[in-house]
Curated annotation (Swiss-Prot):
It is linked to Myasthenic syndrome, congenital, 12: A form of congenital myasthenic syndrome, a group of disorders characterized by failure of neuromuscular transmission, including pre-synaptic, synaptic, and post-synaptic disorders that are not of autoimmune origin. Clinical features are easy fatigability and muscle weakness. CMS12 is characterized by onset of proximal muscle weakness in the first decade. Individuals with this condition have a recognizable pattern of weakness of shoulder and pelvic girdle muscles, and sparing of ocular or facial muscles. Residues 377-516, 548-689 form the SIS domain. Its EC number is 2.6.1.16. Homotetramer, may also exist as homodimers. Keywords: Aminotransferase, Biological rhythms, Congenital myasthenic syndrome, Disease variant, Glutamine amidotransferase, Phosphoprotein, Repeat, Transferase. The lineage of its organism: Eukaryota, Metazoa, Chordata, Craniata, Vertebrata. It comes from Homo sapiens. This is Glutamine--fructose-6-phosphate aminotransferase [isomerizing] 1.
Length: 699
């Protein structure tokens, strides 16, 4: 949903122009998450002394694209872009409207007052903001926006106005604020009262910190500092400890005595360091590959160029520190290259992405599968009584697509659940269930809530994600990283096929010791081996599919029909068309045709049917004849070796043959391409469809 980016340079001189360029570039890297407005907050004034400028915060906010914000920044007449800052914190945000319409006043950063004493950027939803707003209004604080976030900015100002001591730290104020908040949030704060300091925190929404320095860092594992006495508003003292040691002085900066020197992260030899706060790694990878992923209720503070991480209270299972991790992502992976859009690039990356999903895991010489993330739990999974796959959107369709092969190879009942419905029903979950959570981002709010629901009931939890360090990958007992590479386009393509392959690999791993399954396992593994080449063959049909799109783009609706392994393909193809073309589209189980959908069929209704040479072939042929009998003119996606269907149908898209349980990967790609070309012909932004976000981090 919303995108957070902040940049702090400490003793690394940067001009205001360079700082703003970094902030704008960070927002551009987060555009794929979906947004309707954007804003930046930075030090104003044109003094040569950075500390004087830090006492004046300037906000620039704009409805629309980041490009419009960039243009607005350069329109400022009274702003010297060449002023140099030795220390500076700038924060930036792309907003997805949840409370209040898209407008500059509702955009972030939100401010505490007209003097911009405190500003904050926020991703998430505060559920008790009305109560907080009512309280703050009773104390004389005036509100100018309709957002829930403004209550946070006003609340930190209230905490500051009512602090018990001049030495109360920025971190302490933020801790007091988040104790009052209910809901989900990732927050970064900036204040004129604490120049050069940044405080970030999260609960339920992702936040990471990138670190860049030319010098050796003091540690690669930051200990968590716990408050040894619960902080209360109006309390006289604040004490901190890490494993029994005090780690903070009264001003909130790190006490670097011999005992406490490892409680902060800082450059050992020099003070020069840069920090980047962001919603995800795509915004920081061009600056640094060293990052710290924050956990729920972490409060990260940068004071005097030193980073420390705090928590209000210790709970069972808390990890004692946060590791500095090295990202493997490369900048060119998130660039478009020679393609017109990220979605097009990601569709054409699928031959490589499925190889990356299988690399090091599938041995085609001895027909073995090794999923390292599941190795320690595979015996427990094999003893379970039921598999439950929980997901949303495209990830849900990946579960539906592989349900049949999972049931066949594991001989277990398999449920595939939409996360929101799963939670609404309070679905019974037992200790001998194994629950899978599928999410490209690893941050999908409903799926994450489902994970916590299942953990409370004692089930073994397995994550299937594309994002290292995501909430789902951290909170599950074990999992599989699909290794599809960064997916920027809002409409998921390569993540779907990689999730599909990952679940098939899991099914193969589950039955590796069953003699009765060996021939079937070998057949599927040979299919996996040939899959990348077959995907390339399907992609070579792009011109043919573009021609079909020119015939359909003026239509208002399209029906997609299939059954068996291809019901999920119908659902996924219809979703892609809905998402980026804004055409009504419906995925229909061909077995349900006579139970209502057949009434929609006439000579004007576009119909796409998927008919493959598998166990449902005869029934799909019956459905085809019913559509033709109602003057329907279906386009049939079929096996290129199916001469009967090709001969009896006027329009076909012929895909190569694969093993039945993998054929859905080859049949979905023409629908991905069709959706892409329809959107282009209709004049829409393929990567950023209206009203949609890449990562849905609120319920």
């Amino acid at each position: 949903m919303c995108g957070i980016f902040a940049y702090l340079n400490y003793h690394v001189p940067r001009t205001r122009r360079e700082i703003l360029e970094t902030l704008i570039k960070g927002l551009q890297r987060l555009e794929y998450r979906g947004y309707d407005s954007a804003g930046v907050g930075f030090d104003g004034g044109n003094d040569k002394d950075w500390e004087a400028n830090a006492c004046k915060i300037q906000l620039i906010k704009k409805k629309g694209k980041v490009k419009a914000l960039d243009e607005e920044v350069h329109k400022q007449q009274d702003m010297d872009l060449d002023i140099e800052f030795d220390v500076h914190l700038g924060i930036a945000h792309t907003r997805w409207a949840t409370h209040g319409e898209p407008s500059p006043v509702n955009s972030h950063p939100q401010r505490s007052d007209k003097n911009n004493e405190f500003i904050v950027i926020h991703n998430g939803i505060i559920t008790n903001y009305k109560d907080l707003k009512k309280f703050l209004e009773s104390k004389g604080y005036d509100f100018e926006s309709e957002t829930d976030t403004e209550t946070i900015a006003k609340l930190v100002k209230y905490m500051y106005d009512n602090r018990e001591s001049q030495d109360t730290s920025f971190t302490t104020l933020v801790e007091r604020v988040i104790q009052q908040l209910e809901g989900a949030f990732a927050l970064v704060f900036k204040s004129v009262h604490f120049p050069g300091q940044a405080v970030g925190t999260r609960r339920g929404s992702p936040l990471l910190i990138g670190v860049r320095s030319e010098h050796k860092l003091s540690t690669d594992h930051i200990p968590i500092l716990y408050r040894t006495a619960r902080t209360q508003i109006g309390s006289k003292f604040t004490r901190w400890g890490s494993q029994g040691e005090r780690g903070k002085d009264k001003k909130g900066s790190c006490n670097l005595s011999r005992v406490d020197s490892t409680t902060c992260l800082f450059p050992v030899e020099e003070k020069a360091v840069e920090y980047y706060f962001a919603s995800d790694a795509s915004a920081v990878i061009e600056h640094t590959n060293r990052v710290i992923f924050l956990e729920d209720d972490d409060v990260a503070a940068v004071v005097d160029g030193r980073l420390s991480i705090h928590r209000i209270k210790r709970t069972a299972g808390d990890h004692p520190g946060r590791a500095v991790q090295t990202l493997q992502m490369e900048l060119q992976q998130i660039m478009k290259g020679n393609f017109s859009s990220f979605m097009q690039k990601e569709i054409f990356e699928q031959p490589e992405s499925v190889v990356n999903t299988m690399r090091g895991r599938v041995n085609f010489d001895d027909y073995t599968v090794n999923l390292g993330g599941l190795k320690d739990h595979i015996k427990e999974i094999q003893r379970c009584r039921r598999l439950i796959l929980i997901a949303c959107g495209t990830s849900y369709h990946a579960g539906v697509a592989t349900r049949q092969v999972l049931e066949e190879l594991t001989e277990l009942p398999v449920m595939v659940e939409l996360a929101s419905d799963f939670l609404d029903r309070n679905t019974p979950v037992f200790r001998d269930d194994v629950c899978f959570f599928l999410s490209q981002s690893g941050e999908t709010a409903d799926t994450l809530m489902g994970l916590r629901y299942c953990k409370e009931r004692g089930a073994l939890t397995v994550g299937i994600t594309n994002t290292v360090g995501s909430s789902i990958s951290r909170e599950t007992d074990c999992g599989v990283h699909i290794n599809a590479g960064p997916e920027i386009g809002v409409a998921s393509t390569k993540a779907y096929t990689s999730q599909f392959v990952s679940l098939v690999m899991f099914a193969l791993m589950m039955c590796d010791d069953r003699i009765s399954m060996q021939e079937r396992r070998k057949e599927i593994m040979l299919g996996l081996k040939r899959l990348p080449d077959l995907i390339k063959e399907v992609l070579s049909m792009d011109d043919e599919i573009q021609k079909l799109a020119t015939e359909l783009y003026h239509q208002k609706s399209v029906l997609i029909m299939g059954r068996g392994y291809h019901y999920a393909t119908c659902l996924e193809g219809a979703l892609k068309i809905k998402e980026i073309t804004y055409m009504h589209s419906e995925g229909i189980l061909a077995g349900e045709l006579k139970h209502g959908p057949l009434a929609l069929v006439d000579k004007l209704m576009p119909v796409i049917m998927i008919i493959m040479r598998d166990h449902t072939y005869a029934k799909c042929q019956n459905a085809l004849q019913q559509v033709v009998a109602r003057q329907g003119r279906p386009v049939v996606i079929c096996d290129k070796e199916d001469t009967e269907t090709i001969k009896n149908t006027k329009r076909t898209i012929k895909v190569p043959h694969s093993v039945d349980c993998l054929q859905g990967i080859l049949s979905v790609i023409p629908l991905q391409l069709l959706a892409f070309h329809l959107a282009v012909l209709r004049g829409y932004d393929v990567d950023f469809p209206r009203n949609l976000a890449k990562s849905v981090t609120v319920e």
